Amino acid sequence: MTRPQYYRIKLKRIPGKYRSYQPLPVTRYSPSKLRKQVEAFAIYFKREFDYAIREFDAREKDPYTAYLFPDPHANVWIGACCFRPESYAYDVDSETLRWIWLHPYHRMKGVLTEAWPFFRASHGDFFVEPPLSLGMLHFVLRHNRGSRFFGYYEKLAGQSQLGFVNGISKAEH
């Protein structure tokens, strides 16, 4: 795979029966085509943030609820996120938003802001698992003031102002 192909983002058309203005829930029982689309966004997430592991596999059997974000005007999927019953690395007794990826064009355009109340209603006071980009940290601080995890996010924000995010200096990113 050439370098330009490695970084190419392909947005797939939304099949007619799944067209909506709301994020589409995807579970381990959903059609393979939907699970594979979530997996594709997990691969983009891995590449963008230079992670060693992929956060989602379409074949996995552990419980999760992922969501595909639609662009209803263009009828394409523009991103995904995944909730799990627990955190991978943190000792919290809560559902956890383990990862989220949106196409760069659609970031900061209200997609997540619009979906957030739905996520809170569906998953309660969930934990947003670090590491968080500075943009995501800012979003979480703005939209989770009533969360029992708010103090933790404030602590992360303090570290980021000192040049650290999750214990890693910005220079190391």
Give each language-model segment a name:
Residues 1-106, 117-127, 132-137, 142-146, ...:
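Non-catalytic substrate-recognition and accessory regions of acyl/acetyltransferase enzymes
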Residues 109-114:
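A short glycine-leucine-enriched loop at secondary-structure breakpoints
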